[in-house]
Amino acid sequence: MSTDDSPYKQAFSLFDRHGTGRIPKTSIGDLLRACGQNPTLAEITEIESTLPAEVDMEQFLQVLNRPNGFDMPGDPEEFVKGFQVFDKDATGMIGVGELRYVLTSLGEKLSNEEMDELLKGVPVKDGMVNYHDFVQMILAN
């Protein structure tokens, strides 16, 4: 298969809105995610700091194939422990409001739009979410 037909080239072309063979470096995180990677915001910031304002396919492939790869999403138990801090009664449940606060205000922050999209697929019972199930669902996607 030639490079022109690769899924990476196809994804790159979708981000190359002007057909110049270059994309803005600010699109690199979204492009990496479109190619199945899961870079953290810190990784994206580090990568963007090393790139010119616009990135060509060859530069993108160097980023995509970087020697140390990208951080793995993490162990489910680590995420569960993080939510347990907010579970004062040890019920395995967290309020939707608290979940929204945690995910939009702490660590790798989600936007409100991302949070709304995420909550569409989460079973909510009496304003509460089972965070064990939530973690499994997120990591499965």
Curated annotation (Swiss-Prot):
One of its GO terms (molecular function) is metal ion binding. This is Myosin regulatory light chain cdc4. Its main location: cytoplasm. The modification Phosphoserine is found at S2, S6. The gene is cdc4. It is found in: Cytoplasm. Ca(2+) binds at D87, D89, T91, M93, E98. In vitro, this chain does not seem to bind calcium.
